[in-house]
């Protein structure tokens, strides 16, 4: 795809988790810590088994959350309850269901705390954000949980670079719903054809921008597999590629 810029923009919208902030890295560390801290070897043959049960179910829940099929509270709880109930050693665990539910609640709470503590910027994120902020009003558009997102923003040291922050819970709708993008447009006083959205998730960031009639830059993080059914206005392998476009 030709990444030559063909029009000018008045504002830039950008996703946060795994576009600017390294949520995947923070989550990996958090899951490792929790496996040891809460003796999850009682439920699983290995840490790898725990992660193998957690990851696909978590992705499934986030997909349902994006479609308003489950609540935030259900997502937070069930992404840990499900693995606990399906661990290969569950039959040997001598405890009541209420104990497993309580553990899932504890894991859910600690996961949010740990991923926030382990927050870091992705490679090239600070350079990109400061570069873009000199040229455009920047707006974060995120589905992340409000109780931790602002703390991550503060830890980033980039607060002064953003004109607006649009969070799913504060707006009452989420990506890929066009309404969250329309709220960002309203706050910036621009129309859909005057902005571009940057994000790593095709299902929420790119499809959402398409739904709102907004151009997109899809950050694919050097994924080698082809996805011919998924298109974007521009596609880049990393954050440095965005500066070549904008």
Regions found by a protein language model. Give the residues of each.
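Hydrophobic alpha-helical core bundles mediating ligand binding, dimerization, or RNAP-core interactions
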Residues: 27-35, 54-58, 80, 108-115, ...
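Short, acidic loop-to-helix structural element flanking the phosphoryl-transfer center
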Residues: 74, 100-101, 105, 109-140
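Short helix-capping segments at alpha-helix termini
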Residues: 39-43, 87-91, 157-161, 189-190
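Residues in soluble alpha-helical coiled-coils and helical-bundle/repeat scaffolds
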Residues: 21-25, 116, 120, 193
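A metal-dependent, Asp-based hydrolase signature
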Residues: 56-110
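Asp-based, Mg2+/Mn2+-dependent phosphohydrolase catalytic module
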Residues: 1-12, 130, 139-141, 145-246
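Active-site neighborhood of HAD-like aspartate-dependent phosphohydrolases
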Residues: 2-53
């Amino acid at each position: 795809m030709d990444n030559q810029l063909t029009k000018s923009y008045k504002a830039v919208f950008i996703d946060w988790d795994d576009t600017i902030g390294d949520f995947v890295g923070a989550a990996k560390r958090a899951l490792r810590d929790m496996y040891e801290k809460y003796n999850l070897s009682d439920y699983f043959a290995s840490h790898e088994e725990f992660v193998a049960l957690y990851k696909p179910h978590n992705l499934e829940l986030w997909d349902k959350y994006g479609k308003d099929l489950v609540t935030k509270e259900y997502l937070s709880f069930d992404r840990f309850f499900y693995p606990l109930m399906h661990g290969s050693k569950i039959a040997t665990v001598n405890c009541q269901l209420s104990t497993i539910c309580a553990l899932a609640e504890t894991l859910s709470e600690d996961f949010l705390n740990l991923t926030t503590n382990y927050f870091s910027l992705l490679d090239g994120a600070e350079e990109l954000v400061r570069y873009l902020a000199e040229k455009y009003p920047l707006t974060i558009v995120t589905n992340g949980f409000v109780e931790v997102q602002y703390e991550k923003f503060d830890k980033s040291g980039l607060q002064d670079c953003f004109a607006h922050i649009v969070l799913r819970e504060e707006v009452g709708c989420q990506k890929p719903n066009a309404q969250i993008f329309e709220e960002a447009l309203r706050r910036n006083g621009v129309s859909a054809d005057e902005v571009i959205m940057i994000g790593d998730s095709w299902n929420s960031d790119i499809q959402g921008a398409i739904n709102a009639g907004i151009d997109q830059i899809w950050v694919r993080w050097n994924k080698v597999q082809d996805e011919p059914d998924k298109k974007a206005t521009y596609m880049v392998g990393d954050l440095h590629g965005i500066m070549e476009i904008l």
